[in-house]
UniProtKB/Swiss-Prot annotation:
Residues 417-503 form the Disintegrin domain. The conserved cysteine present in the cysteine-switch motif binds the catalytic zinc ion, thus inhibiting the enzyme. The dissociation of the cysteine from the zinc ion upon the activation-peptide release activates the enzyme. The chain crosses the membrane at residues 702-722. The gene is ADAM33. This is Disintegrin and metalloproteinase domain-containing protein 33. Gene3D superfamilies: Collagenase (Catalytic Domain) (3.40.390.10), Disintegrin domain (4.10.70.10). Residues 184-205, 746-813 are annotated as: Disordered.
């Protein structure tokens, strides 16, 4: 009798129950239930007391830096942690709502938090992101193939935080969400959760980077899923922000959280299972928020599940735009890194990044996390942005997008007392290079945040080798037609805030208007989609195709996701219609859709763009004409409508500039060279009150430019006199009509040697004098026959030893 495995009674039922427990719950994403890990008790290693461990049960303050010892699978690990000092911006606030619906705004110390980043000693490719608010929780990555998650066990709510568990990320299964409508029908929709973001080096104060001032909102459903615990909900948002910061650092973008908000009583904007409707309702609410609390981007994190497998949505290239700088994401994972990866992905779309096509992500394999802009969210812990994403980001910045990211968080906002060592230069500090143990700044004393002897500065784009750059040194070049340059002031180490041309300023040689710092034109948008050979289709294409109100031609969607047909006057603001070109690397996941219309008895091809099903749900606005695009004389596209805009603010500003300058986004004059701000009505160097002085330290250069402007008109006359003086054998004669060569004073019959630098010299004539009066004839040099013929000049012959001509004595006046 053969051996057969024994099967316990009820096994099928137990397996079914187990699958039901492990099957993903919409909106939760990560499999619910306890995944067994290895018990571990991490300990702080106190500075000054080597290897004396302190249990987490003991009260320990939240140090700026510290070491944590723990064991994972029999291996001793020493975590080198540093508080993320720049996570919360100066002036950071927290908002929730009381029972009466009134907002309650708190301004906690923006440096007193418990969110860390770091590495594992002895593992060069490691990275760590930890929260130490209640026990310890977070990701520990040793290498591409070894990632762990640490968390308290028993879970939060218990008063015993001394016991934790650590497990490999491969043990955790997660929901494989995509950007399409496809619902999984089997376990193929499940995937292992790999390791997380890539490690980064110590922050370099002098390195130029962008700053994303972020505002995060938790909706009412998320508050309920956190058991109505306000502190737990806020900590969830802070953990997400810490991960988003880690991910965006790979693009040289630093997150500064300006505020978080929890909708404790009810949703302040409509939140439904329709991602599109939820997004536009939130963006409408966000406009009111921005007026009270300026920020660069607002992100809504919801506890609801969107229809299908959608986990996030954001407008393409919406960053810094009043109507579209934001996004929505579902909190689809038990672990905060899942929501953070989705949020970073949607922020990427706001920055003009599309999904990575196949073969684009070579920086990280899928099993080790992949890249952030992957179309599917089956790998919720991506390591980096791909080279394709970086290329798209550079293109976005080159055309003027994301102008608001150039400005660091406003240090003038009300903040708690300064804390030396937090990485922010605050009131009373000359510099701040972070905690003293790791400060390597040669310009700054870490212990008291003061400059070293002889140092003028320590940080900033206008600081080099501890010295301020001179006033007028360029610190930020203009990016695109609608940007303006900024210059060092000579008194500050920081470049002045970025400003750009005021909305409505003409750009692209008059074919467009500046809008939010960019110059959107149909030509530029066609070439972005279909390459350099593409151009806008005739207006008839827009009129016919966009009147259909379908996926191929429309003026956007309503709150229910239905396509809207374009009215006749709005046709140029719907789906972009082009001709020529081919798919561009800057717009993967887009396929051309050609339509044919009849125009003047001929067939005309109109090319639109349609997103592939795998890309369309979290990319809002793909293939549509960008806001601010010119659609008629003094008319621009706004909210898919062609609206007349008198640009009255621009006209008022230009009037004040006396026709000698342009207007910037602060409604101040940016003067042309030769005119001085603020009103461009007096001589000066150009620039504006906001740009910093334009070469103010180089007065000689300015005087030289003014001198040249006077002397340049005289150069032709001076050149003529020189030529007449140097021409071979040229007797110049004064006559009633000017000056001409005298044949008697000419050189060889065949002219100069053909290889001489002068080549063939042609006779030159000058017209009458400036006064119009003829010059008096000189009887000695007139053309009348002379009774005393001149002595003949010697013949000129080329020098066989040199490639030059022997020049005769010059003719004089």
């Amino acid at each position: 009798m053969g051996w057969r495995p024994r099967r316990a009674r009820g096994t099928p039922l137990l397996l079914l129950l187990l699958l039901l427990l492990l099957w993903p719950v919409p909106g939760a994403g990560v499999l619910q239930g306890h995944i067994p890990g290895q018990p571990v008790t991490p300990h702080w290693v106190l500075d000054g007391q080597p290897w004396r461990t302190v249990s987490l049960e003991e009260p320990v303050s939240k140090p700026d830096m510290g070491l944590v010892a723990l064991e994972a699978e029999g291996q001793e690990l020493l975590l080198e942690l540093e508080k993320n000092h720049r996570l919360l911006a100066p002036g950071y606030i927290e908002t929730h709502y009381g029972p009466d619906g009134q907002p309650v705004v708190l301004a906690p110390n923006h440096t007193d938090h418990c969110h860390y980043q770091g590495r594992v000693r002895g593992f060069p490719d490691s990275w760590v992101v930890l929260c130490t608010c209640s026990g310890m929780s977070g990701l520990i990555t040793l290498s591409r193939n070894a990632s762990y998650y640490l968390r308290p066990w028993p879970p939060r709510g218990s008063k015993d935080f001394s016991t934790h568990e650590i497990f490999r990320m491969e043990q955790l299964l997660t929901w494989k969400g995509t950007c399409g409508h496809r619902d999984p029908g089997n376990k193929a929709g499940m995937t292992s959760l790999p390791g997380g973001p890539q490690s980064r080096g110590r922050r370099e104060a002098r390195r130029t980077r962008k700053y994303l001032e972020l505002y995060i909102v938790a909706d009412h459903t998320l508050f309920l899923t956190r058991h109505r615990n306000l502190n737990h909900t806020k900590q969830r948002l802070l953990e997400v922000a810490n991960y988003v910061d880690q991910l965006l650092r790979t693009l040289d973008i630093q997150v500064a959280l300006t505020g978080l908000e929890v909708w404790t009583e009810r949703d302040r904007s409509r939140v439904t299972q329709d991602a599109n409707a939820t997004l536009w309702a939130f963006l409408q609410w966000r406009r009111g928020l921005w007026a009270q609390r300026p920020h660069d981007s607002a992100q809504l994190l919801t506890g609801r599940a969107f229809q299908g497998a959608t986990v996030g949505l954001a407008p393409v290239e919406g960053m810094c735009r009043a109507e579209s700088s934001g996004g929505v994401s579902t909190d689809h994972s038990e672990l905060p890194i899942g929501a953070a990866a989705t949020m970073a992905h949607e922020i990427g779309h706001s920055l003009g990044l599309s999904h990575d096509p196949d073969g684009c992500c070579v920086e990280a394999a899928a099993e080790s996390g992949g890249c952030v802009m992957a179309a599917a969210t089956g790998h919720p812990f991506p390591r980096v942005f791909s080279a394709c994403s970086r290329r798209q980001l550079r293109a976005f910045f080159r055309k003027g997008g994301g102008a608001c990211l150039s400005n660091a968080p406003d240090p003038g906002l009300p903040v708690p007392p300064a804390l030396c060592g937090n990485g922010f230069v605050e009131a009373g500090e000359e510099c701040d290079c972070g905690p003293g143990q790791e400060c390597r700044d040669l310009c700054c004393f870490a212990h008291n945040c003061s400059l070293r002897p002889g140092a003028q500065c320590a940080h900033g784009d206008c600081c080099v080798r501890c010295l301020l750059k001179p006033a007028g040194a360029l610190c930020r070049q203009a990016m695109g037609d609608c940007d303006l340059p900024e210059f060092c002031t000579g008194t500050s180490s920081h470049c002045p805030p970025d400003v750009y041309l005021l909305d409505g300023s003409p750009c692209a040689r008059g074919s467009g208007y500046c809008w939010d710092g960019a110059c959107p034109t149909l030509e530029q948008q066609c070439q972005q989609l279909w390459g350099p050979g593409s151009h806008p289709a005739p207006e008839a294409c827009f009129q016919v195709v966009n009147s259909a109100g379908d996926a191929h031609g429309n003026c956007g969607q309503d709150s229910e996701g239905h396509f809207l047909p374009c009215a006749g006057r709005d046709a140029l603001c719907g789906k972009l219609q082009c001709q020529g070109g081919k798919p561009s690397l800057l717009a993967p996941h887009m396929v051309p859709v050609d339509s044919t219309v009849h125009l003047d008895g001929q067939e005309v091809t109109c090319r639109g763009a349609l997103a592939l099903p795998s890309a369309q749900l979290d990319l809002l606005g793909l293939g549509l004409v960008e806001p601010g695009t010119q659609c008629g004389p003094r008319m621009v596209c706004q909210s898919r409508r062609c609206r007349k805009n008198a640009f009255q603010e621009l006209q008022r500003c230009l009037t004040a500039c006396h026709s000698h300058g342009v207007c910037n986004s602060n409604h101040n004059c940016h003067c042309a060279p030769g005119w001085a701000p603020p009103f461009c009505d007096k001589p000066g160097f150009g620039g504006s009150m906001d740009s910093g002085p334009v070469q103010a330290e180089n007065h000689d250069t300015f005087l030289l430019a003014m001198l040249l402007s006077v002397l340049l008109p005289l150069l032709p006359g001076a050149g003529l006199a020189w030529c007449c003086y140097r021409l071979p054998g040229a007797h110049l004669q004064r006559c009633s009509w000017g000056c001409r060569r005298d044949p008697a004073c000419s050189g060889p019959k065949d002219g100069p040697h053909r290889d001489h630098p002068l080549g063939g010299v042609h006779p030159m004539e000058l017209g009458p004098t400036a006064t119009g009066q003829p010059w008096p004839l000189d009887p000695e040099n007139s053309h009348e026959p002379s009774s005393h013929p001149e002595k003949p000049l010697p013949a000129v012959s080329p020098d066989p030893q040199a490639d030059q001509v022997q020049m005769p004595r010059s003719c004089l006046w």
